């Protein structure tokens, strides 16, 4: 239940309040951070995957509802270790992958989010995958 509350229900509450402020202005951006688990289930991740699927569906519904009113709703997928103190301290072997582009830089994630926010209305993206080149999707093991 906690996973669903943190991933899906919190997204609903946050999105609702953000939309409430943005609607009178006729513009704004709401970004719901997703994960690959929200697009494709995986054994052992039922609670997380279910919650992330719910968040993605919420984002898609809000995009259809709010887009015509000038609010850009997007669902960037962030998949991979992020260069944080938590990763450096608890997963030093993952952190070593930074030298080879195998860990996400928070500044680069921010650049991608800014890109979504500044897109012209005639070319809005809904989903953008952010992952290091060394993720298995690229055939690297």
Segments and roles (model prediction):
Residues 3:
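A hydrophobic alpha-helix adjacent to the NAD(P)-binding/active-site core of NAD(P)-dependent oxidoreductases
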Residues 15-16, 60:
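A short, exposed helix-loop element centered on a Lys and neighboring polar residues
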Residues 17-26:
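A short helix-coil junction within the Rossmann-fold of NAD(P)-dependent oxidoreductases
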Residues 25, 42-43, 87:
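Conserved catalytic-core motifs of eukaryotic protein kinase domains, centered on the activation segment
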Residues 29-54, 60, 64-68, 82:
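Catalytic loop of short-chain dehydrogenase/reductase
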Residues 68-80, 94-138:
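C-terminal helical subdomain
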């Amino acid at each position: 239940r906690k996973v669903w509350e943190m991933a899906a229900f919190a997204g609903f509450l946050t999105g609702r309040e953000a939309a409430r402020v943005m609607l009178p202005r006729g513009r704004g951006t709401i970004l719901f951070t997703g994960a690959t688990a929200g697009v494709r289930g995986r054994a052992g991740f039922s609670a997380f995957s279910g919650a992330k699927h719910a968040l993605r569906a919420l984002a898609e519904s809000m995009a259809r509802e709010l887009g015509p009113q000038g609010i850009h709703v997007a669902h960037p997928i962030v998949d991979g270790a992020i260069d944080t103190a938590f990763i450096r301290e608890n997963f030093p072997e993952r952190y070593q992958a930074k030298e080879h582009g195998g860990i996400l830089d928070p500044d680069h994630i921010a650049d991608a989010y800014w890109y979504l926010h500044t897109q012209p209305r005639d070319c809005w993206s809904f989903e953008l995958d952010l992952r290091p080149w060394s993720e298995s999707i690229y055939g690297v093991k």
